[in-house]
From Swiss-Prot:
<feature type="binding site">
    <location>
        <position position="96"/>
    </location>
    <ligand>
        <name>Mg(2+) 1</name>
    </ligand>
</feature>
<keyword id="KW-0456">Lyase</keyword>
<feature type="binding site">
    <location>
        <position position="594"/>
    </location>
    <ligand>
        <name>dimethylallyl diphosphate</name>
    </ligand>
</feature>
<feature type="binding site">
    <location>
        <position position="96"/>
    </location>
    <ligand>
        <name>substrate</name>
    </ligand>
</feature>
<feature type="binding site">
    <location>
        <position position="602"/>
    </location>
    <ligand>
        <name>dimethylallyl diphosphate</name>
    </ligand>
</feature>
<feature type="binding site">
    <location>
        <position position="471"/>
    </location>
    <ligand>
        <name>isopentenyl diphosphate</name>
    </ligand>
</feature>
<dbReference type="GO" id="GO:0008299">
    <property type="term" value="P:isoprenoid biosynthetic process"/>
</dbReference>
<dbReference type="Pfam" id="PF00348">
    <property type="entry name" value="polyprenyl_synt"/>
</dbReference>
<comment type="similarity">
    <text>In the N-terminal section; belongs to the terpene synthase family.</text>
</comment>
<keyword id="KW-0511">Multifunctional enzyme</keyword>
<dbReference type="GO" id="GO:0046165">
    <property type="term" value="P:alcohol biosynthetic process"/>
</dbReference>
<dbReference type="GO" id="GO:0046872">
    <property type="term" value="F:metal ion binding"/>
</dbReference>
<keyword id="KW-0460">Magnesium</keyword>
<comment type="similarity">
    <text>In the C-terminal section; belongs to the FPP/GGPP synthase family.</text>
</comment>
<feature type="binding site">
    <location>
        <position position="465"/>
    </location>
    <ligand>
        <name>Mg(2+) 3</name>
    </ligand>
</feature>
<feature type="binding site">
    <location>
        <position position="587"/>
    </location>
    <ligand>
        <name>dimethylallyl diphosphate</name>
    </ligand>
</feature>
<keyword id="KW-0808">Transferase</keyword>
Amino acid sequence: MDQLSYQSRLIPPEEAQQTGCFTSLPIRIHPRNDIADAATAKFIADWAKHVGDGREKRTHFCPSRVGNWNSLLYPEGLPERLGSVSYLLDLGLIHDDVNEELSVQDAMAAHERLRPALDPQDNRKWDPESPQMKFKMLLSECVIECIKTDRELGTAMLKSFRVLWLDIAENATSDAPQTMDDYWDVRMTNGGMSVFWPMVLYATNLRLSEEQHTLVQPIIAAAEEALCWANDYFSYEREVWELETGKAKRIVNIVEMVSRTKGLSSAEAKAEVKRMILGAEAKYCRLRDDLLSSNPEMSMDLKRWIEYIGLSISGNHYWLSACSRQNTWKTNCSIDGKINGLTNGSVNDTNNRSVDGVVNGTVDTGIEEPSTGNKDTSLKALKLLFNSTPNESHPVCRYPNDKLSDYAMVAPMTHISSLPSKGTRSELISALNVWLKVPPVVLGHISSAIDMLHNASLILDDIQDNSPLRRGVPAAHVVFGTAQSINSATFMFVKATEAVRSTLSPAALEALLRGLQTLFMGQSWDLYWKHNLQCPAEGDYIRMVDHKTGGMFVMLVQLMAAESPYYGASVIEDLERLMRLLGRFYQIRDDYMNFSAYSAQKGFAEDLDEGKFSFPVVCGFERDPELRGQILAIFRQRPTSGAGEATQLSRKVKEHLIRCIAASGGFDETLKCLRSLENELDTEIAELEKKLGQVNPLLRLCLATLSMEGCEKICW
């Protein structure tokens, strides 16, 4: 490993040994420990601001007298990435502290509350005061930073937090493990190892192939043993003390298991675990040396990765030996320094008890058995029905005025509502409310109305575009028929209007009606151009988008503004401008992505099937007259089904048109436009944050999830 260069400082062994550290591996510390400490300070302040439960005053975080945990775990990490991984690790510490005080079931619920904050694509609606929304506010800035810094590695790291940690952590049985294999299974689910390695890769900006990951996996396994055993070794006394004082519900520790299963005293069990730690480190070194000697042409990145694994082992060990997290409990011991429960060599898990979840008794189904009536009575009833005299009223006259079932009405609505959603609207509502502060109940009414309007417009759009798919699923009119779907969509507009009238202010109703007129006006021109095979000029297309797509976003702002007491007309005008820009970005992005892999959810280049003049086509027309002739000729001859509906163009025809658009520069101009709009949106958000005196991480997160940064250029 002499070929490698280091930015970190080597810790002298004699210095490390003063803390009780006994690792056999070299220890290094990041030169910018101040960045990691600053991230911890920010996390503590943010937790107090957004969560406010006082937990930040009781948790021991990453800083220590020998250095920040992150500076020792990622000594070769990029300085600009050290802050974000430090922030996330502090989150892990405070979250683990909470879970140690909970039962397994309650810990799982705590994981569930945190999960949405780590998912940039989460589009569920959360009450502003809910734990989920508090966590989203807490983590939005960090999530944005990770994605913007490195979309690939940042997204992978966040996904590992969400999927590999939250989704499986604490799902293990609460029974005390009896064998090493049992214990290792528990540690792999709640120890966070699956999350740690993506953090190292992100911090160090290393990208490895699947083959390289597989090659180094045995080394990773040895490292995980050393990391876990060291954590258990240095945390054992603290965990016992917390269990016996009621501060924790359970203990999961290899020292406890060795003591319990082998009948050893605590001191003997710790000595055994110490040998296990050194054995795991020796195994890492042996596997490392074997791999290097058998692969003399190994890439420098893979060599770095193997070295960084070892530095994580030693850095973790050193920090554990000195950090306040594992040592401050000592000040709470009894005067003679003894810890209750350590003398008999075992600690019982107070949470290891069975729960009788069976409720005795019968279940009433609510269904009665049919009675056996008299046949004669039934026959008399039939005779009365079919042999009635003219003086008797017909049964039709006697039918009660009962309401019809609403199944036929709501079925298309239910179908469209059940489909996967991009979640932009719900994310945008939460983001705008950071500034507008609409009360939660009122915000729920606005959100419900917007959802109905949006779903109604989707049903009509699919009908008007002859689109067979919506999010990869048959569109509503394909399942329920065009006429029924139109009827259902129209009813949704009426229902949304009634909901606004009955639950919101007159100003909100006025905003809704004005917004609906704008939406229909924009849609009319989109349909007109398609029907008349008339390609609009770029300016006309943007005005249509401002009415159709931007109109929905502007209407949302106006509805929220009507219910917000905080800001005047000038601020609302700024927000409306921001929404119009967002509408342009959103629609043009959708036009561009229709020609990319995203289109698989709707159908490959479906806009061409519909004869739609999307933005890339408009740009191509303005730059290449020859393209105009070819596209118009093909659109004019589009095949139709027996019902008069357009059918798909052949793939070869589509590929030809896409090559023409690419050759004309239509895709390049579209991508250039999108990047300019994204920068403009970022500037507008910054100006609003300055004007309103409040940053809006949720709005920036919303923009980051739509970002075109790193988007592949369409080339044919």
